[in-house]
């Protein structure tokens, strides 16, 4: 493990297109990094660590980079708090954002939230999964914070369901509330301590194309309002009422740079780069892969359709976006037919 001297590295490649770890260097864009096999060999010889080129990692990195630029998700000197569960999505996101420390001069902070899921704590500090998370943060030279909350998200959602008329709240809802409460509070504290506008501190989530298309289809199947994830969302201050107490949600900005990326490409990129991720969903009894939820069925339906229509997930998201755009311009549904 070594600390990379950027001045020396620049002799061989453009570090704006490399993900730099202490134990390896990943190539985000071979052409833009100006890398040849000879230069890769020289880097390995001088720094004593492997240079890994993965076509999938390059593809994902390029696509995420274009998505960030198109939607202006990240600005120079932003502070980006990555919600790091250690799973495939958030871990790959952390690696992809590493280059923006050099490109845009951003500051990266990785934060893991230790939530209580009916007595199960997948992100407790002494677990093997969290040790793996800490290892990756150390290799990327990114500060890591663990935020703990003892409230049981299963009990919280039972309270909401009991006091709601005809609505059922899953533990996933209260889990997301706890995470946003803690991450939003941290973002506010950082903005105040740094004396910068809250817009300069952003929360980064690893939601991908599968997540977005599954969500859209599940909402349709449940007869709910059409909801989907956006590249950048501004949230106003809000409170979730749990009867005997309220959980405040601070004003914040959430970014989702991984929205155009398929889950299978995320897994393939990590595998090709030799990056082990925490299978945190195996620890949670309410994850998509367990049970018989509508969301799981929607995932399976789209997975099956992908065999015949490879871009079906992009089409689902595109249709939702076009529908919202249409009705925002035509509130009474006029059509020019």
Swiss-Prot record:
Cite the binding residues for ATP. 83, 179, 206
Q: Which terms are listed as keywords in the entry?
A: 4Fe-4S, ATP-binding, Iron, Iron-sulfur, Metal-binding, Nucleotide-binding, Transferase
EC number of the protein: 2.8.1.-
Q: Which InterPro entries match?
A: Rossmann-like_a/b/a_fold (IPR014729), TilS/TtcA_N (IPR011063), tRNA_thiolation_TtcA_Ctu1 (IPR035107)
GO BP annotations of the record are: tRNA wobble position uridine thiolation
- What residues bind [4Fe-4S] cluster, as annotated? 172, 175, 284
- What cofactors does this protein use? [4Fe-4S] cluster; Mg(2+)
Co-factor: note: Binds 1 [4Fe-4S] cluster per subunit. The cluster is chelated by three Cys residues.
What GO MF terms are annotated? Answer: 4 iron, 4 sulfur cluster binding; ATP binding; metal ion binding; transferase activity; tRNA binding
Which cellular component appears as one GO term in the record? cytosolic tRNA wobble base thiouridylase complex
Q: Name one Pfam family in it.
A: ATP_bind_3
Similarity remark: Belongs to the TtcA family.
Query: What protein is this chain from?
Result: Probable sulfurtransferase
What is the species listed in this Swiss-Prot or TrEMBL entry? Methanocaldococcus jannaschii (strain ATCC 43067 / DSM 2661 / JAL-1 / JCM 10045 / NBRC 100440) (Methanococcus jannaschii)
């Amino acid at each position: 493990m070594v600390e990379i001297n950027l001045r020396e590295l620049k002799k061989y490649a453009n570090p704006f297109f490399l993900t730099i770890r202490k134990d390896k260097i990943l190539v985000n864009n071979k052409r833009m990094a100006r890398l040849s096999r000879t230069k890769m060999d020289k880097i390995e010889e001088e720094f004593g660590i492997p240079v890994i080129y993965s076509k999938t990692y390059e593809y994902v990195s390029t696509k995420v980079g274009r998505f960030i630029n198109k939607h202006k998700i990240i600005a120079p000197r932003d502070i980006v708090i990555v919600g790091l569960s250690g799973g495939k999505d958030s871990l790959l996101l952390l690696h992809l954002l590493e280059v923006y420390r050099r490109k845009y001069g951003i500051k990266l902070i990785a934060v893991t939230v230790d939530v209580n899921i009916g007595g199960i704590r997948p992100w407790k500090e002494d677990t093997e999964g969290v040790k793996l998370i800490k290892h990756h943060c150390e290799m990327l030279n990114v500060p890591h914070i663990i935020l703990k909350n003892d409230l049981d998200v299963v009990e919280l959602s039972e309270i909401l369901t009991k006091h709601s008329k005809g609505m059922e709240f899953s533990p996933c809802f209260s889990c997301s509330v706890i995470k946003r409460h803690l991450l939003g509070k941290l973002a506010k504290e950082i903005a105040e301590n740094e004396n910068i506008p809250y817009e300069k501190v952003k929360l980064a989530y690893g939601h991908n194309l599968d997540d977005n298309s599954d969500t859209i289809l599940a909402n349709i199947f449940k007869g709910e309002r059409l909801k989907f994830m956006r590249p950048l969302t501004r949230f106003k201050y809000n409170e979730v009422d749990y009867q005997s107490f309220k959980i405040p949600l601070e004003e914040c900005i959430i970014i989702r740079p991984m929205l155009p990326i398929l889950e299978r490409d995320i897994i393939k990129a990590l595998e090709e780069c030799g990056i082990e991720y925490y299978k945190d969903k195996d620890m949670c009894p309410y994850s998509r892969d367990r049970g018989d939820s509508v969301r799981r069925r929607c995932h399976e339906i789209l997975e099956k359709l992908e065999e015949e229509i490879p871009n079906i997930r992009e089409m689902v998201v595109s249709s939702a976006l076009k529908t919202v755009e249409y009705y925002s311009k035509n509130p009474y549904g006029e059509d020019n037919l």
